[in-house]
Swiss-Prot record:
SUPFAM superfamilies: Glucocorticoid receptor-like (DNA-binding domain), P-loop containing nucleoside triphosphate hydrolases. Transmembrane segments: none annotated. Belongs to the ClpX chaperone family. This is ATP-dependent Clp protease ATP-binding subunit ClpX. ATP binds at P126, T127, G128, C129, G130, K131, T132, Y133. Residues 1-54 form the ClpX-type ZB domain. One of its GO terms (biological process) is cell division.
Length: 427
């Protein structure tokens, strides 16, 4: 029995180390003690975790039209892809909400025992047409963790390269290591076409960066409890792992699939066979990514099991000149607006003439880089003036013309006194 008179014999909390005189209550267990303060702290932690788990079930899920309208504000064109993504994402999170509400939602009807399967998304289209940006914008609207991974860095377990579990680590990091939050996030895997198997027939030799990666991705796409090394890299038996359930993680996989249009055309009978054989009646414009079928993806090099785990297939199309011009100026965070804000921080108004926007769009089309190349062209055009302006306080505005874009000249710099004279004349 502990003696109460001597400080050395006072009972202490096994967790915080406070003695029984420093706390209101000390509860004894088999060889351990816990004080009332530590019990309160434990209750707070448990309540916070339970609140986080229920968080998604309580938030108001935007309807497909609301998601579509939000995408319209930031992404130019690609209406079919935006519609498909809006519906797929809405159905995915509606499914999670139904699961979190459980039997209360079912209300005793005959659908009680129906379990809704997950619908991951395959996004097909040429580079620079907004595939990644669509996924990023979706995640921002839903306020869920979002991670981007590159399929080309992945290899089968045991070979040099990244394991597929490292993709999940990126999502956990995006959720600030809150696993419950990460389990309801979105993972975007780019360059998925680069892990197609090297030949249409199964190979005898190992294809560690192609078919092997597809096989490794199957389980996490479908839904499994994966063990993720907290520091990334390869697994080894003596390290601790983070356990994450991917059942409610939405996977959006995307790729350019160069050569897929030829496969689609061959299937549809567009191409003739043999020397001098006539071509089919369909023109090249009539068939494209939008006509893709699962059998085309199989011929391209995706394995049947992988295609089966991507039930929603949607496509984006090439961006034409008007679309590129719209991307430059119309969205909420359009490139022109971004650079105008940057110049405004130096007290300068940046002005683009209409023909300058046309010239920038034409250069992007010539380079074949799509929307992704617009920023690079803008940087090239504005670099000289961005170098000079911070050192000059006499400049009120900079005007970019088509000649500046095409020939590499410097934008026209208009001093403050010239602007003041123009205002006085107009007054």
């Amino acid at each position: 029995m502990a003696r109460m008179g001597e400080s050395t014999d006072l009972l202490k909390c096994s967790f915080c180390g406070k003695s029984q005189k420093q706390v209101r209550k000390l509860i004894a267990g088999p060889g351990v003690y816990i004080c009332d303060e530590c019990i309160e702290l434990c209750n707070e932690i448990i309540e916070e975790e339970l609140a986080e788990v229920a968080d998604l079930g309580q938030f108001e899920l935007p309807k497909p039209k609301e998601i579509f309208n939000f995408l319209q504000e930031y992404v130019i064109g690609q209406e079919p892809a935006k519609r498909s993504l809006s519906v797929a994402v809405y159905n995915h999170y509606k499914r999670i909400q139904a699961g979190s509400k459980g039997s209360a939602l079912a209300d005793g009807n005959h659908h009680d025992d129906v379990e809704i399967a997950k619908s991951n998304i395959l996004l097909i289209g040429p580079t620079g047409c907004g595939k990644t940006y669509l996924a990023q914008t979706l995640a921002r609207r839903l306020n869920v963790p979002f991670a981007v991974a590159d399929a080309t860095a992945l290899t089968e377990a045991g070979y040099v390269g990244e394991d597929v579990e490292n993709i999940l680590l990126k999502l956990i990091q995006a959720a600030d290591y809150d696993v419950k939050k990460a389990e309801q996030g979105i993972i975007y895997i780019d360059e998925i076409d680069k892990i197609s198997r090297k030949s249409e027939n199964p190979s005898i030799t190992r294809d560690v960066s192609g078919e092997g990666v597809q096989q490794a991705l199957l389980k996490i796409l479908e839904g499994t409890v994966a063990s993720v090394p907290p520091q990334g890299g390869r697994k080894h038996p003596h390290q601790e792992f983070i356990q994450i359930d991917t059942t409610n993680v939405l996977f959006i996989v995307a790729g350019a699939f160069a050569g897929l249009e030829e496969i689609i055309g061959a299937r549809a009978g567009k191409k003739g066979i043999g020397f001098g054989a006539p071509l089919g009646a369909l023109s090249g414009d009539e068939l494209g990514y939008g006509d893709v079928m699962p059998e085309d993806l199989l011929k391209f090099g995706l394995i049947p099991e992988f295609i089966g785990r991507l039930p929603v297939i949607t496509t984006v199309s090439h961006l034409d000149r008007p679309a590129l011009m719209q991307i430059l100026s119309e969205p909420k965070n359009a490139l022109i607006k971004q650079y105008q804000k940057m110049f405004h921080l130096d007290g300068v108004d940046l002005v683009f003439e209409d023909d300058a926007l046309e010239a920038i769009a034409d250069q992007a089309l010539e380079r074949g880089t799509g929307a992704r190349g617009l920023r690079a062209i803008m940087e090239e055009v504005l670099l000289p003036v961005m170098f000079e302006l911070p050192s000059r306080e006499d400049i009120a505005s900079a005007v970019v013309t088509a000649e500046v874009v095409r020939e590499g000249g410097q934008p026209t710099l208009i001093p403050h006194d010239v602007v003041a004279k123009r205002r006085n004349k107009s007054a």
